[in-house]
Amino acid sequence: TPVSAVGSTDMHAQTQQHQDGKKDKVIQFVEILEREQQIVLNNSFTHISSLKKYDGLSVDHALKIALAANEEALNSDGRLNAKYILPRIDEYYLGQLLYFLMLSVAYEGELADVDAYDQPGVETYKQIMKQKMSHQ
């Protein structure tokens, strides 16, 4: 079941399950090599010496370090993971990634003997919903 996570906040919320839970998932990362805008951290807490090292650090660099650390932790425990590297976010590269992921869902459906296109398993809920909505 796909679950999305963006950045280190979402990643942190799910890392415990990924690292110590069942080994029944493939964790997928998307790394963007070139970004149009760079956000730079400004240290508002100059009186805290341990935070001085983060002044001037780009958010992009921090996210790449978080991705690499998470990837290394997963690998150290034999957890399946994949990293998709896009040169930049644009229609061409995003389209390629989405096409690849759509094909992988179709392929996985075939391997698991699940109809990924017709989705007959959804029909029961749709029929119940239709009946309930007609009684409103």
Each predicted region: which residue ranges?
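A SIS-like phosphosugar-recognition module
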Residues: 1-136
